[in-house]
Amino acid sequence: MSELSHVTEAGDVRMVDVGGKPLSRRRAVARATVRMAAETARRLRELPKGDALATAQVAGIMAAKRTSELIPLCHPLALSHVQVSLEVGAEGVEITGVVETTAQTGVEMEALTAVSVAALTVYDMAKAIDKGMSVTDITLVEKTKEPA
């Protein structure tokens, strides 16, 4: 079990000590897709609950900032940049999240959390008119680290 950084030799979980690591510029990009009927995709800005795209964008940004409260072993980070964009296509919405910081640990969980919560927000807001939606392809597409 020792190759898992969050698990001790005894099998206990822990938050990794990053105190001795130097500060680095960190960036992560994640994506998620919400598949839906074409008619649903056309109506996303005019749903009974309101504009799903604007709401999901804000929800994703808020989620990135609260990742350490949602995922127990994540470090709380001061994020310098969060961007969530939603692109509507005929078969649904592709969500991209970009997160940046200067810290001792990466921001991939923040980017993944941003797109996941944005996708769930789209789903929540459109579920009344489309019972066949699915959230798919939540993935990390880029992770970079440069000296600060």
What are these regions (language model features)?
Residues 1-75, 79-148:
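C-terminal binding/interaction regions
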